[in-house]
């Protein structure tokens, strides 16, 4: 049956069964004969059950939510009640405190009266009548005192009650408090300052006298009434009256609160009327009050007259006190309204003090807490509060409150309440206000500024101001900071950064704040600095909150920076660069920023210490950072700060003297653009970058160098083969060819880093590259041995010195741009492809700002010096180093391509332009042709500068003519040096170029030596323009870069004219004139073999460093070494060799230059390819082979550089030797190099000094080179990574030197530490030998 039943049930229900949920009963019955229908029914059942459960759950959830809400509401109400009690307690406490002085006696008597009242209920009942009467009278008094009755003025006491009532009903106008109580004197006015009562006392006293007169009349009557009244009743009435007084005063307050202004006149008049009215009603109470007053104060009547004036007589008569209190209180109310209105505040002392103090407090916010109700004038609110509290108190603490309610207490209470309350109010309001001012400035600025990680800038802002002292030690250890290491800088910065980091972090914040409100930032500097001083260490909350990311970033940067320092040493490693091209650059930048901040701060400190300009630098740097920060702030605060700092450091140092504003703008814009983008990217990457860079430390800088190599490549590519290189590397960049500097740097960066993945980023990187390259320069400067700071300083000085003498303006531009470019190139060759790009881009930025006047973006290289020297150098530098850097960076990613490129670039720095070895010979030819154009272009934007500034270029060449020499501080000396040493290298033509192109070739020695001196910071003049141009350049970059290309073409023709006459081939044959020869060859499109050779030679020298001499201002130094510098740069490229050779070269400029020129090829096989390119017209294949085959490269460099054969031979020989020796040499040389400029400032000050002796020539060179080596110092880490990346071959060496090595080279120009960094880089890369140079660089 069971089965049947279920089946039957299922059968009939079969259709519904699977469509409807089954009941449990059905399921049970079907359990024996389970069917698909049963499954369907069960499913339906379960679904329904589930839905019910869910719906029930939702209902329960809603109920729980409702319960939670109710609980919260209850809790809120409970807290509200609790707070109400607290407020009541506080109010009473304040009032009691305030009133205690006045009310003590009355309170005691009131208590006595209370006891009496308690004793006799009849008395209490009797007292109620007076109290009621008082309440009525108070109400009438309020009406009369606070309001004017149009019908009757408050003088008619006869019909006052009726009139008062009628008035209340009919016409009541609030009295103008200020009729009887004129406003107190304006705060700050003479009367206000001169008179203690500030205009309140006299009126208050008059009012008091009026009140006292009225009071005396009333009092006499009241006294008579008091005599008639019983004492007990008097006491009770007194208490009642006090209560009533409280009530009335409350009513008065309410009315007064409403009609605070109407109080005084009418109050007084009404008080008289009310007093008269009250007298009849109050006969008992008034008598009691008078009796009490008489008893209390014997002469109640006499004092009653005075009472209004002396609140102390408040006890005298509760009635009278009420009146007077009213008057006073009304005045209080009036005064509340007119905190300053003296008339009614009978307690002038209190009124002026309470009201005055309170008034002022009210202004301060003293009364704000209590007086928050309505009036600025605390007393009105407080009278109200007092009234309210008086009411509460009158009920709660009648005796104490009564008296407070009483005019005396209330008024004094108000006054004191305001004094006390006002003080708390003051504290509270002031706290909010003070924090608000601070935080508002901070937060509003920090909000945008610091959110962005302008912490770095902020750091500099506040850090510089604050850290300047902190960094004085750093400044002190500029050698340490810069020379000692980035590590030192960072260690100092990291170590000092703990302090400095705290400072910087705080300064970041503070700076960020400064930046935030640039206008405010100066203001904030005081306050921020005050805060920063707090905030630096104490106010970090604000600063950190504002700049926490910066702080974190900075703290990260500080720790990471030390970590990165080693990494930074390998700063320009391609891996890291590539990986961190953007990330790394960002990291680098931030690290650079951190380093730069630390170093620049230190540098700023140094500079501040060393110069007023330094102060400008420090201060301006802060300011600069402020502006750049504020501008860059949102976009790329940290990076832009870092770069702003970096480039701005150079710029600001240079621009210091020249342009603060421009500095800021320059930094801003350059960094804004360069860093802004980088910052955006790198800000994001900052932590990663730092982490990445921590990993790739060098990459930190390496990445920017990676960016830098692209930038450098851009320049070269732009210069030489924007199409070719960028055809090869990026047709975009070829398209960008005009903007190649920008784009190429970017695309080179991208190619290197992203393989041109991000053109936008590339652009940003281009921008970044400029800034980043600057930053990288700086970063490389920092990286090398914080060459940035050193480099910046040296650059500022070295570069400045390089450019200082003749090219302070242009030099500043060039120094910042060229030096930065050169540094970027010297460094950036490894680290500074970006920097070169930065210089191109930044120089475009700088130049465009700087060189809007010096139209050529490439003031750096386009400047006459740069244009001539640097153009070739730029081409070579960028071709070699930048391409190398590009390729070093790219190398990390595409070692072969980049190496090829680098090698190609390295081969012919112009080959870098030819670099597109796919386009190799064509590239060389084109680039040979282009090189005339592009050398300038490659020079960066040098043609830009050269051509755009044709006028400017004349200028810039005149200035820049100085600049390349100045850029080649040692190049100047090197020019001297190179002339002897590099006459072999066709340095004469080089020098012609330098002399012509670098008009300040003479200055170069001076510049190199003198101009590079740290005491001679780079002038910010050019930088200012560069900054302005730079920001505009961001928009203008492409056009200007195109213009630069056109100018490069034009300039190349000019350069060809100039440089062809200068024997580009001869120079290249010499191999010495890598800058000159390079450029001439670049320019000398006529002889493609020459051009190729020139390119190769230029590439070799560029990579070698002599070529960099021109193109890389650092290389200009290198160039200045021309080949000696080539050693630096070739060594720099090779950097272990090159640097060692270079250092040796500096030591032995002539022999070493030759050797080092040889060594750089040895040192950098990329150079070898470069040199093969130099040696062989068709060394493009060699470039490719050389870049790829080490031997070919080595061999080629020898042919390329016959003079350089020694150099290259040395470099080749020394490459192995110099890899070991060069590492040592690099250590010593780089140290010396660094010692000379950057390392003198930075890591290797002692060596630098030694080098400076040797390097007097090299000083110029090494002003750049020092920066270069500063970068080299930083570079070593990159090198080690490059080593890993590019380690396999000297191609890697060369390429890595150029890729890394060029980055190293680029690093040379970049910081001129780039060489130092490339050296270490090379060390890492080529062999661990270069690790020694790292160690040699003071552990850099």
Swiss-Prot record:
A motif (LFa 10) lies at residues 725-737. Component of the WASH core complex also described as WASH regulatory complex (SHRC) composed of WASHC1, WASHC2, WASHC3, WASHC4 and WASHC5; in the complex interacts (via N-terminus) directly with WASHC1. The WASH core complex associates with the F-actin-capping protein dimer (formed by CAPZA1, CAPZA2 or CAPZA3 and CAPZB) in a transient or substoichiometric manner which was initially described as WASH complex. Interacts with VPS35; mediates the association with the retromer CSC complex. Interacts with FKBP15. GO terms for molecular function: phosphatidylinositol phosphate binding; retromer complex binding. Residues 356-1340 are annotated as: Interaction with VPS35. Residues 232-241, 292-306, 506-516, 636-646, 740-767, 822-833, 916-930 have a biased composition (Basic and acidic residues). This is WASH complex subunit 2. Acts as a component of the WASH core complex that functions as a nucleation-promoting factor (NPF) at the surface of endosomes, where it recruits and activates the Arp2/3 complex to induce actin polymerization, playing a key role in the fission of tubules that serve as transport intermediates during endosome sorting. Mediates the recruitment of the WASH core complex to endosome membranes via binding to phospholipids and VPS35 of the retromer CSC. It comes from the Eukaryota. The gene is Washc2. InterPro entries: FAM21/CAPZIP. A motif (LFa 20) lies at residues 1289-1298. It comes from Pongo abelii. Its main location: membrane. A motif (LFa 16) lies at residues 1170-1184. A motif (LFa 3) lies at residues 449-462. The LFa (leucine-phenylalanine-acidic) motif bind directly to VPS35 of retromer CSC; adjacent motifs can act cooperatively to bind multiple CSCs, although there is significant variability in the affinities of different motifs for retromer. GO terms for biological process: protein localization to endosome; retrograde transport, endosome to Golgi. A motif (LFa 19) lies at residues 1261-1269. Residues 219-231, 249-258, 265-275, 450-461 have a biased composition (Acidic residues). Residues 1027-1045 have a biased composition (Basic residues). A motif (LFa 1) lies at residues 366-377.
């Amino acid at each position: 049956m069971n089965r049947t039943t279920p089946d039957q049930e299922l059968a009939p229900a079969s259709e519904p069964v699977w469509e409807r949920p089954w009941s449990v009963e059905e399921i049970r019955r079907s359990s024996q004969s389970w069917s698909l229908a049963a499954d369907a029914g069960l499913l339906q059942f379960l679904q329904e059950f589930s839905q019910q459960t869910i719906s029930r759950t939702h209902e329960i959830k809603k109920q729980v939510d409702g319960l939670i809400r109710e609980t919260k509401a209850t809790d809120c109400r409970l807290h509200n009640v609790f707070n109400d009690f607290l407020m009541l307690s506080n109010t009473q406490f304040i009032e009691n405190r305030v009133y205690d002085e006045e009310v003590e006696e009355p309170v005691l008597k009131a208590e006595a009266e209370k006891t009496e009242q308690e004793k006799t209920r009849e008395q209490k009942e009797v007292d109620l009548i007076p109290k009621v009467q008082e309440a009525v009278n108070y109400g009438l008094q309020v009406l009369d005192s606070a309001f004017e009755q149009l019908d009757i003025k408050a003088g008619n006491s006869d019909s006052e009650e009726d009139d008062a009532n009628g008035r209340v009903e009919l016409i009541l106008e609030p009295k103008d408090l200020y009729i009887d109580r004129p406003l107190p004197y304006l705060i700050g006015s003479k009367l206000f300052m001169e008179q203690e009562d500030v205009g309140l006392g006299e009126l208050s006293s008059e009012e008091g006298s009026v009140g006292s007169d009225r009071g005396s009349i009333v009092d006499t009557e009241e006294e008579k009434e008091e005599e008639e009244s019983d004492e007990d009743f008097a006491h009770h009435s007194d208490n009642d009256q006090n209560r009533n007084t409280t009530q009335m005063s409350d009513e008065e307050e309410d009315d007064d609160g409403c009609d605070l202004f109407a109080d005084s006149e009418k109050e007084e008049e009404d008080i008289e009327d009310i007093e008269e009215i009250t007298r009849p009603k109050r006969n008992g109470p008034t008598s009691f009050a008078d009796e009490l007053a008489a008893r209390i104060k014997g002469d109640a009547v006499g004092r009653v007259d005075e009472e209004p004036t002396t609140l102390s007589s408040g006890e005298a008569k509760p009635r009278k006190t009420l009146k007077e209190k009213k008057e006073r209180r009304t005045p209080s109310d009036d005064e509340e309204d007119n905190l300053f209105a003296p008339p009614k505040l009978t307690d002038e002392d209190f009124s002026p003090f309470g009201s005055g103090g309170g008034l002022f407090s009210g202004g301060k916010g003293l009364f704000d807490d209590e007086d928050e109700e309505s009036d600025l004038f605390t007393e009105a609110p407080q009278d109200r509060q007092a009234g309210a509290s008086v009411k509460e108190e009158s009920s709660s603490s009648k005796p104490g409150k009564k008296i407070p309610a009483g005019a005396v207490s209330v008024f004094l209470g108000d006054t004191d309440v305001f004094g006390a309350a006002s003080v708390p109010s003051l504290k509270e309001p002031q706290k909010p206000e003070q924090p608000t001012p601070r935080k508002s400035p901070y937060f509003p600025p920090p909000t945008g500024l610091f959110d962005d990680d302008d912490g770095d800038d902020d750091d500099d802002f506040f850090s510089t101001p604050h850290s300047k002292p902190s960094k004085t030690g750093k400044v002190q250890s500029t050698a340490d900071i810069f020379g000692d290491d980035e590590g030192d800088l960072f260690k100092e910065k990291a170590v000092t950064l703990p302090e400095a980091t705290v400072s910087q972090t705080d300064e970041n914040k503070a700076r960020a704040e400064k930046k935030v409100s640039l206008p405010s930032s100066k203001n904030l500097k005081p306050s921020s600095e005050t805060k920063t001083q707090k905030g630096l260490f104490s106010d970090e909350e604000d600063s950190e909150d504002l700049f926490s990311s910066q702080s974190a970033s900075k703290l990260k940067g500080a720790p990471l920076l030390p970590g990165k320092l080693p990494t930074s040493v390998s700063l320009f490693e391609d891996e890291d660069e590539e990986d961190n091209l953007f990330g790394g650059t960002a990291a680098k930048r931030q690290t650079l920023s951190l380093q730069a901040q630390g170093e620049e701060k230190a540098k700023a400190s140094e500079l501040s210490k060393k110069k007023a300009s330094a102060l400008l630098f420090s201060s301006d740097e802060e300011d600069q950072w402020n502006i750049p920060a504020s501008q860059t702030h949102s976009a790329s605060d940290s990076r832009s700060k870092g770069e702003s700092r970096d480039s701005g450091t150079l710029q600001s140092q240079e621009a210091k003297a020249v342009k603060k504003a421009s500095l800021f703008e320059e930094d801003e814009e350059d960094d804004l653009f360069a860093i802004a983008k980088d910052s955006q990217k790198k800000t994001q990457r900052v932590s990663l970058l730092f982490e990445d860079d921590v990993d790739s430390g060098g990459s930190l800088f390496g990445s920017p160098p990676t960016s830098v190599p692209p930038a450098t490549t851009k320049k070269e590519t732009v210069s030489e083969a924007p199409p070719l290189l960028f055809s090869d590397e990026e047709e975009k960049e070829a398209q960008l060819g005009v903007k190649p500097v920008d784009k190429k740097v970017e695309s080179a960066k991208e190619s290197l880093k992203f393989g041109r993945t991000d053109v936008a980023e590339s652009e940003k990187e281009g921008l970044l590259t400029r800034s980043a390259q600057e930053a990288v320069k700086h970063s490389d400067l920092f990286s090398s041995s914080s060459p940035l700071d050193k480099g910046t300083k040296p650059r500022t000085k070295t570069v400045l010195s390089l450019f200082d003498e003749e090219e302070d303006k242009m030099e500043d531009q060039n120094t910042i741009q060229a030096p930065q470019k050169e540094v970027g190139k010297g460094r950036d060759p490894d680290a500074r492809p970006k920097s070169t790009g930065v210089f191109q881009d930044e120089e475009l930025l700088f130049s465009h700002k700087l060189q809007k006047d010096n139209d050529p973006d490439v003031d750096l290289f386009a400047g006459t010096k740069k244009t001539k020297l640097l153009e070739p150098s730029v081409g070579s530098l960028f071709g070699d180093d930048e391409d190398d850097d590009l390729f070093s960076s790219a190398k990390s990613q595409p070692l072969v391509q980049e190496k090829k490129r680098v090698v190609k670039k390295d081969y012919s720095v112009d080959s870098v332009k030819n670099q597109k070895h796919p386009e190799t010979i064509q590239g060389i030819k084109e680039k040979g042709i282009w090189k005339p154009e592009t050398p300038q272009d490659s020079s960066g934007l040098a043609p830009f500068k050269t051509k755009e500034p044709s006028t400017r270029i004349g200028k810039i060449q005149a200035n820049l003519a100085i600049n390349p020499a100045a850029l080649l501080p040692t190049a100047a000396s090197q020019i001297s040096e190179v002339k002897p040493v590099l006459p072999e290298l066709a340095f004469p033509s080089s020098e012609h170029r330098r002399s012509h192109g670098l008009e300040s070739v003479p200055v170069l020695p001076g510049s190199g030596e003198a101009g590079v001196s740290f005491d001679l910071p780079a002038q910010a003049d050019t930088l200012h323009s560069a900054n302005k141009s730079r920001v505009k350049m961001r928009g203008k970059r492409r056009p200007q870069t195109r213009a630069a290309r056109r100018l490069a073409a034009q300039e190349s023709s000019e350069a060809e004219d100039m440089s062809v006459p200068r024997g580009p081939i001869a120079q290249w044959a010499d191999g010495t004139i890598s800058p000159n020869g390079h450029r001439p060859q670049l320019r000398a499109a006529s002889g493609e073999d020459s051009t190729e050779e020139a390119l190769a030679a230029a590439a070799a020298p560029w990579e070698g460093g002599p070529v960099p001499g021109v193109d890389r201002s650092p290389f200009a130094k290198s160039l200045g070494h021309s080949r000696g510098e080539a050693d630096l740069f070739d060594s720099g490229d090779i950097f272990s060799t090159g640097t060692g050779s270079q250092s040796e070269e500096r030591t032995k400029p002539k022999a070493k230059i030759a050797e080092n020129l040889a060594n750089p090829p040895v040192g950098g096989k990329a150079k070898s390819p470069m040199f093969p390119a130099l040696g062989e017209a068709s060394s493009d294949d060699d470039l490719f082979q050389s870049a790829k085959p080490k031997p070919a490269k080595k061999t080629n460099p020898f042919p390329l550089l016959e003079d350089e054969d020694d150099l290259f031979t040395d470099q080749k020989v020394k490459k192995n030797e110099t890899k070991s020796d060069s590492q040592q040499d690099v250590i010593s040389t780089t140290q010396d190099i660094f010692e000379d400029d950057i390392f003198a400032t930075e890591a290797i000050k002692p060596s630098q000094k030694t080098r400076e002796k040797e390097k007097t020539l090299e000083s110029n060179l090494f002003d750049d080179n020092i920066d270069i080596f500063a970068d080299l110092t930083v570079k070593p880490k990159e090198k080690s990574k490059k080593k890993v990346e590019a380690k396999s071959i000297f191609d890697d060496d060369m390429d890595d030197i150029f890729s890394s090595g060029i980055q190293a080279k680029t690093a040379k120009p970049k910081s001129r530490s780039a060489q130092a960094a490339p050296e270490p880089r090379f060390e890492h890369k080529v062999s661990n030998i270069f690790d020694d140079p790292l160690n040699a660089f003071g552990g850099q």
